[in-house]
Amino acid sequence: MSVSVHETRKSRSSTGSMNISVFHKASHPDCVLAHLNTLRKHCMFTDVTLWAGDRAFPCHRAVLAASSRYFEAMFSHGLRESRDDTVNFQDNLHPEVLELLLDFAYSSRIVINEENAESLLEAGDMLQFHDVRDAAAEFLEKNLSPSNCLGMMVLSDAHQCRRLYEFSCRMSLVHFETVRQSEDFNSLSRDTLLDLISRDELETEDERVVFEAILQWVKHDLEQRKVHLPLLLRNVRLALLPSDCLKKAVSGEALLMADECTKLIIDEAFRCKTKILLNDGVVTSPFARPRKAGHTLLILGGQTFMCDKIYQVDHKAKEIIPKADLPSPRKEFSASAIGCKVYVTGGRGSENGVSKDVWVYDTVHEEWSKAAPMLIARFGHGSAELENCLYVVGGHTSLAGIFPASPSVSLKQVEKYDPGDNKWTMVAPMRDGVSNAAVVSAKLKLFVFGGTSIHRDMVSKVQCFDPSDNRWTIKAECPQPWRYTAAAVLGSQIFIMGGDTEYTAASAYRFDCETNQWTRIGDMTAKRMSCHAVASGNKLYVVGGYFGTQRCKTLDCYDPTSDTWNCITSVPYSLIPTAFVSTWKHLPA
């Protein structure tokens, strides 16, 4: 005799083995839930009544507690409602919204539309129907527009919908010149406004837009808000304002001169502006930090893998224009920008000698100069700017006594360059030495993705350096081992693309450096090994690379809002990109 799932008796066959039959009805949970809903509608076995406005909703405590941590806590932790047979939300909850949530609890289905999405998000968060809250947030994401993104930013911040907040914030940054004219803008909290104006991704080529926006916000409620003006001013890139605008602010804006603190801020901005225009040393002031939309894209490359020229990308004309020759052609170097200067570090020269040299290109004055040499000659390394200093990571150096230079094992050593002192110092070495890795900075930390190990294997680790305690940690594993990838940063998101295998060459991923979580994004338009990527505005740009014998001949753009890649322009056949940087576009006099 076989044993049904409902029986507890056991039996054995003649061979002594257990004979069991398990019956499973997949639709049983739906049937039970549907019948409970019928019982609810007929007020059968209900043991609590919810009130919203003037409407009553008889329910089963067990169903509510199973659907919502809010109700589970209410009914089980000795609260008054755990003994009463009614729970009255009064006017804190609209009856139609509560009805929708109860229908979801009893059916697992809910209809979300433009009229109820915001209310469902708020109520779902309040009553801890988190699935409904997240579904409403996803609906609102898909219906974001410049006319509602500020409101969505405020709503999502209040209800811990981080993804909707980032999407809303990103749209507000892209359309800042439009949204700052809306009534929602004047209703922003100080902290939300501060979050917007402090971001590098705010899209404007004229910092006067930001300057005028904060004055507008303060004047909307002058008595309450004037105390916030110094903090807001410190997050405007005042040194990027035209000189006549700064002078006009001093002479014609009484609000700025009414407070000693704001006067000191304006004076500091003037000094910074003068220092830049006179090319008087390195400027690291936050007043002079350009927005990403105020950047230009520079490609370093040549007709061979030996780089000898800088090219500028003209977005509007969709052209790539030669700008300047490198003083010393080289290959396998690294390049990064700090403000208006591009730092070219190390590499190998025409005779394959490994270099310590550091060449600096000033994009404002279009001049080359030499900085202090690195402490270690290296090639195949990575570099990134972090808090106005340059970090050089990993790579190879040459084996002593061998000519031409042969690569050593991958280096662990990391160097830091301070432009103010023109001096290199060693910082803590990496946990694992790597070369050909993707190196970027985000959230005041340095991130190194993959690379080639000391054993010449591909690496799958994400190594992270925190300068505040001079320590490296392993943050996560990459989706697969990587080398010859590109990386670029938008906010707290790091985008990684390309690689040297069939599987990784066209793939792209997003890494959240706050949660250490990976998300696969849309594939690139072509397979790219040794490509180069930068962020500008709220988009990513990728150039160069090859796969097999095929060179990639396009400059492509990724829009994270739509998760799509598009070709911007073709790269001249005579240009093989070796590095790609984003630096100041212009400095208004």
UniProtKB/Swiss-Prot annotation:
Keywords, ordered alphabetically: Kelch repeat, Repeat, Translation regulation, Ubl conjugation pathway
Cellular compartments per GO CC: Cul3-RING ubiquitin ligase complex
Kelch repeats: 296-340, 341-388, 389-444, 446-492, 493-538, 539-585
One function term, GO molecular function aspect: ubiquitin-like ligase-substrate adaptor activity
Gene Ontology BP term (one): negative regulation of fatty acid biosynthetic process
Functional pathway: Protein modification; protein ubiquitination
InterPro entries: BACK, Beta-prop_ATRN-MKLN-like, BTB-kelch_protein, BTB/POZ_dom, Kelch-typ_b-propeller, Kelch_1, KLHL25_BTB_POZ_dom, SKP1/BTB/POZ_sf
Pfam families per UniProt: BACK, Beta-prop_ATRN-LZTR1, BTB
Residue ranges annotated for the BACK domain, each copy included: 149-250
The BTB domain, residue ranges: 46-114
Function, in words: Substrate-specific adapter of a BCR (BTB-CUL3-RBX1) E3 ubiquitin ligase complex involved in various processes, such as translation homeostasis and lipid synthesis. The BCR(KLHL25) ubiquitin ligase complex acts by mediating ubiquitination of hypophosphorylated EIF4EBP1 (4E-BP1): ubiquitination and subsequent degradation of hypophosphorylated EIF4EBP1 (4E-BP1) probably serves as a homeostatic mechanism to maintain translation and prevent eIF4E inhibition when eIF4E levels are low. The BCR(KLHL25) complex does not target EIF4EBP1 (4E-BP1) when it is hyperphosphorylated or associated with eIF4E.
Assembly: Component of the BCR(KLHL25) E3 ubiquitin ligase complex, at least composed of CUL3, KLHL25 and RBX1.
Name of the molecule in the record: Kelch-like protein 25
